[in-house]
Each structure stands twice: as C-alpha cells, then as structure tokens.
Design a protein with these regions (language model features):
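Gly/Pro-rich cap/lid or specificity-loop segments adjacent to the active site
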Residues: 3-186
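Alpha/beta-hydrolase fold active-site neighborhood
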Residues: 180-212
Length: 212
C-alpha cells in the first residue's frame, strides 16, 4: 500500500518515493500533526510528488501482528519482508504509475533499502537521497552499536531533565511490567525489555515530546 501526496498545482512534478526507517515502521501519515511528523515534507513537495510506501508487514501492507505457525514458519515468512522484496514492491509501484525514473529518499533502515535499490535497479532512479542507513567503513557492528547506546543514554538523561516526573512514572511502569501487569490493547503482556524499547523514539526529531 502506498499513498500519493502532492500540492494542488504539483501533480505534474516528478515522483519521490520515501523509504521509511525501522524496520517494521509504517510510512508517516501526512494528515497527522504530531511532533514526529517529517519536517522535510513541505520542502520535498516543492520539487516532487511524494509516494509514501507502507513497507511489507507494516501499516496497510499486510501488517505483521500475531505470530502464525512454529518458529521455522515464522522465520520463513519474515524472509519475504526484507529490503530486497521492498525494492521489488517499489518497482511494481513505479511501473503502475507509468514512469521511467523516480527519485528515492532513504531514512535509516530505508537507507539500506535505497542502497539495495541502487545496486539492483540503478536505471530506475533519477536520484537517491540518504539520511542514514549507510554501513560504516572499517568499523564493526559492535563499534556502531556502542556509539549508538552512548547517544541514547545521553538522550535519555536529557529527556528526564526536561520531564523529571517521567522518571518516576517509568520506574512505576517498569515495576508493573516486571509483574506482568501491563498489557497492550490486543492483550499482549508488556515485559520490561519491551517497555524500555519505547526509548528508541528519543533518537528522532520530536521524540521526547512524543514519548512524554
């Protein structure tokens, strides 16, 4: 599933497909005015019509919710949600729109997907814009994650300094999660590690406000 966003007088402009970060995150909704809404959208619409793709397994593109089958079956299903398959979906959409080339913007995981796109179908892209998602040269994954953890630690301290009451709130939530007393609307029990994963939004613009 993808939605097309354009200004009233911009329907003749070239296309830019946005490859969302994640993985596992749907594309942003242009009608939502929350702090996490992409600030670059207005600028992009000056030059392009924007294609917002819900990548496989997210949003309105057959979202992954309840696990189905045994572990091997689940693992096999997930092999169909990788960057290479997302690129094939992009190509299907490009052909459906009847265009020879379009530009692509890759954010975080979307940058890795864009790199795959450039490697596989360079003739389909007029331009590629990266805002993250490029592998470091000469550095191991452990080095990158160690640096990332330090950044998130600093972001967490900054968040609690800005919203001191949330430190107490999260401590209370962590205690409840440890007892198995927090559940999602679908009935899933929220464990402490899942609760802590909320902190990943602090790495995005407006993440502190969204988490608060």
């Amino acid at each position: 599933y993808a939605r097309l966003v354009a200004t009233p007088n911009g329907t003749d402009k070239p296309y830019l497909v946005f490859l969302q970060g994640g993985p596992g995150c749907e594309s942003p909704r242009p009608t939502l005015r929350d702090p996490g809404f992409p600030g670059w959208l207005s600028r992009a619409l000056e030059d392009y019509q924007l294609v917002l793709l819900d990548q496989r397994g997210t949003g309105l593109s057959s979202p992954v919710s309840e696990p189905v089958g045994d572990a091997p079956s689940q693992a096999e299903y997930l092999t169909h949600l990788r960057a290479d398959e997302i690129v094939e979906d992009c190509e299907d959409i490009r052909r459906h729109l009847g265009i020879q080339k379009w530009a692509a913007l890759g954010q975080s995981f979307g940058g890795f997907t864009l790199l795959r796109y450039l490697s596989t179908y360079p003739e389909s892209l007029s331009a590629g814009y990266f805002t993250g998602g490029l592998s470091a040269v000469g550095r191991s994954a452990d080095d990158i994650y160690a640096a990332c953890y330090e950044q998130l630690r600093a972001k967490s301290l900054e968040y609690y300094k800005r919203f001191p009451g949330d430190r107490v709130r999260f401590a209370e939530l962590a205690a409840l999660a440890k007892k198995g007393e927090i559940a999602t609307p679908s009935g899933d029990v929220v464990c402490p590690s899942r609760l802590r994963s909320l902190g990943h939004v602090l790495g995005a613009s407006g993440g502190a406000e969204k988490l608060h």
